[in-house]
């Protein structure tokens, strides 16, 4: 099964860039041949071709839960963002709309690994809490890849 890991986020805003940091760390560690990892930042449309080819997509992004604790890692389906809920993407990505732009007849399975941010401020680095949580985030992604 061809799996696509999408690291989303804005690297200029500290923890908002956690998806990008996670994608880069995963690339450094290495992945199975059938896994493609893309650091797409906030340019999800740039991944359209890869999205069309994927059978499974794992999205990694900063999300805010109603009573979330910074550094918490959540696993949720894509449709968790399609209606007002207690969880919100940090930069309002709408992968479900992007999927509709593809020529696919069968949508891929999509899982979101969301990470509760501690700090959203001008910085290229993750906050200490999220930097410490990065191995947990990578492990959550690896579990999805292996599933």
Region annotations inferred by a language model:
Residues 1-117, 124-135, 140-147:
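N-terminal catalytic or cofactor-binding beta/alpha core of small enzyme domains
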């Amino acid at each position: 099964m061809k799996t696509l890991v999408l690291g989303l986020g804005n690297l200029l805003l500290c923890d908002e860039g956690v998806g990008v940091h996670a994608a880069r760390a995963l690339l450094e560690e290495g992945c199975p041949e059938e896994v493609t990892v893309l650091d797409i930042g906030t340019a999800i449309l740039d991944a359209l071709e890869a999205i069309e080819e994927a059978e499974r997509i794992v999205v990694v992004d900063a999300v805010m839960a109603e009573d979330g604790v910074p550094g918490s890692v959540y696993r949720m389906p894509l449709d968790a963002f399609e209606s007002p809920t207690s969880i919100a993407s940090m930069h309002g990505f709408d992968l479900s709309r992007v999927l509709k732009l593809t020529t696919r007849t069968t949508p891929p399975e999509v899982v979101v690994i969301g990470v509760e941010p501690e700090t959203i401020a001008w910085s290229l680095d993750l906050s200490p809490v999220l930097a410490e949580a990065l191995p947990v985030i990578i492990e959550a992604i690896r579990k999805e890849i292996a599933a």
